[in-house]
């Protein structure tokens, strides 16, 4: 039972869902993008709030999908091993939602309405979770060094800001959301440990 718990079942499921959605998109053209991409006007004017979640599972191309899924699987597997399947899913989805809300705020402030898709905001949220753990509770991830995580995040942010057509507001928003969620997770774990003592 413990061995099964340590398997990244939720990570694998999320990767599979993203791949299946992308395959459907290749056969249906723009249909899913038209109803699921993060479009500020559609969300804020017409109340299509489901786009805040659906856009997390859409990708702009095979390279976009591949890069995100590789990072999701390996980074997510580390985190899922600590949190368990359901808590990992909650962290992932809330990070993606936080990322997309920040993206919407930026689009309104910058008066931009470029639709965006992708799991990278949620994945940056996982980066934020990991950062919170190594800074606030090293027991959660004892084998990972702060320098390694900070360097990974810095390089990812740099890559985003030096590449065109990247929703950097979602990346930053996801990172901050994930950090706050990771900090909350640390507080809960510490309280449980104190009660057990």
Language model features by range: what are they?
Residues 1-197:
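A detector for small-residue-rich transmembrane helices and their helix-helix packing motifs
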């Amino acid at each position: 039972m413990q061995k099964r718990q340590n398997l990244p079942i939720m990570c694998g499921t999320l990767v599979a869902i993203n791949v299946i959605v992308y395959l459907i998109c290749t056969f249906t053209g723009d249909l899913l993008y038209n109803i699921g991409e993060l479009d500020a006007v559609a969300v804020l004017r017409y109340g299509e709030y489901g786009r805040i979640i659906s856009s997390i599972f859409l990708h702009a191309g095979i390279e976009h999908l591949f890069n995100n899924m590789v990072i999701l699987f390996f980074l997510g597997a580390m985190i899922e091993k600590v949190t368990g399947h359901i808590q990992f899913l909650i962290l992932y989805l809330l990070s993606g939602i936080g990322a997309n809300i920040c993206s919407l705020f930026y689009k309104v402030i910058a008066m931009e309405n470029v639709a965006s898709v992708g799991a990278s905001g949620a994945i940056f949220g996982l980066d934020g979770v990991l950062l919170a753990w190594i800074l606030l509770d090293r027991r959660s991830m004892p084998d990972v060094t702060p320098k390694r995580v900070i360097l990974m995040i810095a390089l990812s942010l740099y890559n985003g800001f030096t590449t065109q057509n990247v929703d950097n507001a979602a990346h930053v928003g996801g990172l901050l959301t994930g950090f706050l969620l990771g900090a909350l997770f640390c507080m809960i774990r510490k309280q449980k440990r104190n009660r057990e003592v």
